[in-house]
A protein has these predicted regions:
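A loop-to-helix transmembrane entry motif
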Residues: 30-37, 52-71
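Membrane-interface helix-boundary signature
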Residues: 1-9, 51-61, 88-92, 113, ...
Length: 152
């Protein structure tokens, strides 16, 4: 169960990192405005009516958030693939706090834009809960600990 849970968490990392990288490329390389405007349902006319400072602030926050999101994905990947899969309970609790916080904040932030990307939030949260749940079962249940020692 520990290996399966860690693979599911690795999928969470890959999706999270890939989305962040795509958005960073969209804003930096393609020089487009933050995709949050489309997610929030702004029409092209509404976007055109926004001031340059407002668009600049949205783009800055988009770059900052997605840079951090990409960094979290890169930093949690080895934590999952090495420490967690080896049965390290500290790695488990770090991932509970870090990824759990991100998932809660994703839903909270989504509320500000009418839950425009709720499907992505649900998918990411389902992956997180399934992965962390399987890992918890393997690390903290008596049968799981025994299995982790013999197969880990």
């Amino acid at each position: 169960m520990l290996k399966t849970g860690s693979w599911i968490l690795s999928i969470w990392c890959a999706i999270n990192g890939l989305l962040a990288l795509i958005i960073l490329g969209y804003v930096i390389v393609l020089r487009q405005d933050s995709p949050i405007l489309q997610v929030a349902g702004f029409s092209p006319a509404e976007i055109a009516a926004l001031s340059a400072r407002t668009l600049g602030a949205l783009n800055a926050f988009t770059l900052l958030y997605n840079s951090c999101s990409l960094a979290v994905s890169i930093l949690t990947w080895p934590l999952i693939r090495r420490e967690l899969v080896a049965g390290d309970q500290r790695a488990f609790w770090i991932l509970v706090v870090v990824i759990g916080w991100i998932e809660v904040m994703a839903f909270w932030a989504s509320a500000y834009v009418g839950h425009g990307r709720w499907q992505g939030n649900v998918l990411q949260s389902a992956l997180y809960l399934a992965g962390i749940g399987l890992c918890a079962s393997a690390l903290f249940s008596p049968n799981g600990r025994r299995q982790a020692r013999t197969t880990g």
